[in-house]
Amino acid sequence: MSQLDKIAQQGKLSLGLVFPIEAYSGSVAKMENQEKLAKRAEELGFKALWFRDVPFNDPSFGDAGQLYDPWVYMTHIMNHTETIALATGSIILPLRHPVHTAKSLFSLQELSKGRIILGLASGDRPSEYPAFDRDLGQKSDLFRDSFSYLKALHSDFPVHRSSFYGSLNGQIDLLPKHRYATPMLVTGHSGQSLNWIAENSDGWIYYPRDFRFLEQTMQNWRQALAQTDQEWKPYIQSLYIDLLESKAAHPAPIHLGFKGGSDYTLAHLKLLESHGVNHVIINLKYGSRPAEEVLEELGKSILPHFV
């Protein structure tokens, strides 16, 4: 059983957290007590911790993520936790050579004894592409090409020819060898058709939308799986939450999420579950309370209702 099987089950919903696990204004988080919060999240029953790939701080974008390189920081958090899944949300494939991505992935998958889930994306910050001498207009092709290369590297002494990243002639092999299955998820559309995502990935990560839009999105996802002769694959989404102190507090929208009490939060998550969402990545950036308090309340009032 892969980590994806543990966090995403058909007809059920689980919860994860994305770093930074804190509320912060502006682009740059303080990144304080993250190790303690990660360990507490594991103890409370969150199923995954998510790490972002943000090479540069673009002030116009407004969020620099967890600041540290995702592979380095994942290794750090791995050493402060025991079993919780560690997921990238998401590695920007066009900006990294697939060999380097695979080397980091295989190394950490082995060292963590199979705790890694690989979320992949084409990137949503155009300002980063010139710094890597990448053509933004080719990002869809770059993503697809890198994805194929990365899959090829899972084979022994692989043979593969890439249009952008080089070729493999079967004479060299990438170590360490991987003993654990690594789920590969696509974030957003990454410039690909939904049928391509359904056929080639192990699941789809998308963004929070209103329930009418979500219903159509889920219908499109199931249709894409059917059209490509695929069995069920999980649907994962992010969600910004400002959990207010009063459990009965009325909800109000915030960017890509809501603020409200635990009563509304539970009802909202249950509705997501009924629509077929399998895992929700909670982001606390816009919170009004200390993350420690929010984690404890989520652990007491929300987590017992989900897998």
Task: Locate predicted features.
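Acidic (Asp/Glu)-rich catalytic clusters
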Residues: 5-9, 42-43, 74-82, 105, ...
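N-terminal beta1-alpha1-beta2 module of alpha/beta enzyme domains
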Residues: 1-80, 182, 285-288, 297, ...
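Hydrophobic faces of well-ordered beta-strands that scaffold small-molecule active sites
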Residues: 15-19, 49-51, 86-88, 116-120, ...
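Active-site mouth loops of central-metabolism enzymes
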Residues: 19-31, 91-99, 180-189, 250-263
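Flexible, glycine-rich active-site loops centered on histidine and acidic residues
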Residues: 10, 14-29, 94-160, 212, ...
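An alpha-helical appendage that flanks or caps ligand/catalytic pockets
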Residues: 1-11, 132, 137-178, 207-307
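Conserved, mostly hydrophobic/aromatic
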Residues: 45, 53, 77, 108, ...
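Short, acidic/polar
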Residues: 28-41, 104, 186-196, 260-272
